[in-house]
A protein has these predicted regions:
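Hydrophobic alpha-helical segments at protein termini of multi-pass membrane proteins
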Residues: 1-130
Length: 130
């Protein structure tokens, strides 16, 4: 049963990764770089949790707006963007406008894959801060 649930959590990510890869019609990105981008999405989670803690200490709040915007949106997207800028931005393979969509999608899907797994296996405490 756990394998089936895990597959349900990961399958949408795999489908989207393949779809996005196929959309890059002119100059496909190296699979190694795409795997790195996916890994960066996974690695953005600790940075997200750190940023969430900093924002919570600095601002604090419990409203739906606060949680959605300051505890989820800003830390998550900023963490993904920072890793993109540090690792992918200056890479020689990043040479077309569409590459930004491809790489950021892979980063986002790396994050989403872990988030999906955490949702289906009930890691509520950690999830509440993502």
């Amino acid at each position: 049963m756990d394998i089936f649930i895990l597959a349900l959590a990961i399958l949408p990510v795999i489908v989207l990764l393949i779809y996005i890869y196929k959309q890059d019609k002119y100059e496909k990105e190296p699979v190694r770089m795409l795997a790195l981008a996916f890994l960066l999405g996974i690695l953005s989670i600790p940075l997200t949790l750190f940023l969430d803690g900093v924002i919570d200490v600095m601002i604090g709040g419990t409203s739906v707006f606060y949680v959605a915007f300051f505890q989820a949106g800003i830390p998550e997207e900023f963490a993904k963007w920072v890793l993109f800028m540090l690792v992918i931005w200056r890479n020689k393979n990043f040479d077309e406008f569409f590459d930004g969509i491809v790489y950021m999608s892979f980063i986002g899907l790396g994050f989403a894959c872990v988030e999906n797994i955490m949702y289906v296996f009930g890691e509520q405490e950690l999830l509440s801060s993502l």
